[in-house]
């Protein structure tokens, strides 16, 4: 719904709290000012109305839906045990650094990138090298030659954001 205005300035919104100047339109964070669709809010209301917020398991069918989507989009048939559900991308980035890298090992991170990608290796006391994106007619792209030059015996992981944030480049 692009026509309804949702006032968020007094809701502790990170986006709107950053700048006090009312003439600044904050576009520094991927936080949209659109109302959430009823298909999402109605089931949430049902859960709230139930009045109990105990522990919840991830529905088995959700993993199968993910497997089917990956197979459809990429032809890759993943194993169910490869899927680990986490509460968000930032948690996943930190877990990836902690579990896939030993101390002293390095992740290659495109730059610029959403800050939590940069933060994850530091949070987990792992190494990082930046692979600076190149401008190709206004489109931010990976420099594959530079990526190859950054590889070493200690490089064990490449962070990848698709679509890329910032810039919006969709890699395929």
Specify the residue positions occupied by each region the protein language model found:
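Conserved core of the PLP fold type I
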Residues: 53-172
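N-terminal small-domain helix-loop-helix segment of the aminotransferase-like
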Residues: 1-88, 95
């Amino acid at each position: 719904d692009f026509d309804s205005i949702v006032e968020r300035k007094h809701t502790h919104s990170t986006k709107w709290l950053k700048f006090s100047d009312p003439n600044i339109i904050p576009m520094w964070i991927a936080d949209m000012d659109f109302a959430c669709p009823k298909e999402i809010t109605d089931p949430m209301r049902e859960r709230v109305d139930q009045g109990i917020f105990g522990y919840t398991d991830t529905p088995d069918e959700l993993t199968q839906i993910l497997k089917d989507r990956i197979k459809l989009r990429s032809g890759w048939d993943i194993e169910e045990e490869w899927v680990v559900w986490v509460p968000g991308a930032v948690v996943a980035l930190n877990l990836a650094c902690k579990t896939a890298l030993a101390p002293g090992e390095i992740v290659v991170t495109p730059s610029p990138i959403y800050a939590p990608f940069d933060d994850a290796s530091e949070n987990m006391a792992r190494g990082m090298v930046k692979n600076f994106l190149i401008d190709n007619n206004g489109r931010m792209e990976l420099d594959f030659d530079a990526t190859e030059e950054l590889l070493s015996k200690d490089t064990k992981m490449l962070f990848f954001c698709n679509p890329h944030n910032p810039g919006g480049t969709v890699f395929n």
